[in-house]
């Protein structure tokens, strides 16, 4: 039994939750001033909680949609005979309908997504050339909105590393993602496909920044594809795409690492709910007398004109967030 002297030295047990927890820890560990440590921990939690909301929640929502897409595709694959295959006989027709509605909903809620100028996309085959943000999520929104609004399906050319990512085979197949040899692209266009490509690719995605610099280098293969397939080129740009997700590509070591191993190992941050508007420019018609170099320069100028017209440079995350509260532009 505890004696009266021992009881008097310990004093009363504290009544507040934090003080009581500190008291228990102090008695158990023998460490003094545990209440100060707990108070500091509570303060840190209070400070870091908004940061966790800003950085973790958007990523969690995105990956929830992505994993939901994969789950729906696996369910569809098992039960696809019970879904509508559509008039085209496409066995993935029902899956496409599910995915485009999921991603269009994500775009509407998270970015207030708008698509402008889709009347510039002809009913004939065409090659869409777009600026590549840090993430291709704006292309997903565009593809979904175009299919919902125009019933027009757009295929896209992706870097070879995408096809090596585990678990994406079905997702890639349903979204019409293609590996990009010139012959494959020309064949797809001659079959009547609408095809999208970003000449800047992964390098532009990782190492362009809020100045929206187009980083094509000497790439002109896309122009030769359009010439060989005898199709128009259509420029496309998404406003604020760099403010949605930022990269640390300005750090030289990441650029050197990419050039050595050609894998996109560059940290990203953000997933901010900024305003996204995709703008489709006027078509550059097929010209049998133009060279690939001339068509490349012409396309780059058209894309730069879209950026200059619709993007305030340098991009600003706060301004892009505030644009969510501006009057919604009427979609074409």
From Swiss-Prot:
Query: What top-level branch of life does the organism fall under?
Result: Eukaryota
| Keyword Transmembrane helix (UniProt) | yes
Q: Which UniProt keywords are present, listed alphabetically? A: Acyltransferase, Endoplasmic reticulum, Glycoprotein, Lipid metabolism, Membrane, Transferase, Transmembrane, Transmembrane helix
Q: Could you tell me which CDD domains the record lists for this protein?
A: LPLAT_MGAT-like
Q: Which reaction does it catalyse?
A: a 1,2-diacylglycerol + a 1,2-diacyl-sn-glycero-3-phosphocholine = a triacylglycerol + a 1-acyl-sn-glycero-3-phosphocholine; a 1-O-alkyl-2-acyl-sn-glycero-3-phosphocholine + a 1,2-diacylglycerol = a 1-O-alkyl-sn-glycero-3-phosphocholine + a triacylglycerol; a 2-acylglycerol + an acyl-CoA = a 1,2-diacylglycerol + CoA; an acyl-CoA + a 1,2-diacyl-sn-glycerol = a triacyl-sn-glycerol + CoA
| Stored InterPro entries | Plipid/glycerol_acylTrfase
CC per GO annotation = endoplasmic reticulum membrane; membrane
What residues bear carbohydrate chains? 5, 289
Q: Where is the active site?
A: 132
Protein name in UniProt: DGAT1/2-independent enzyme synthesizing storage lipids
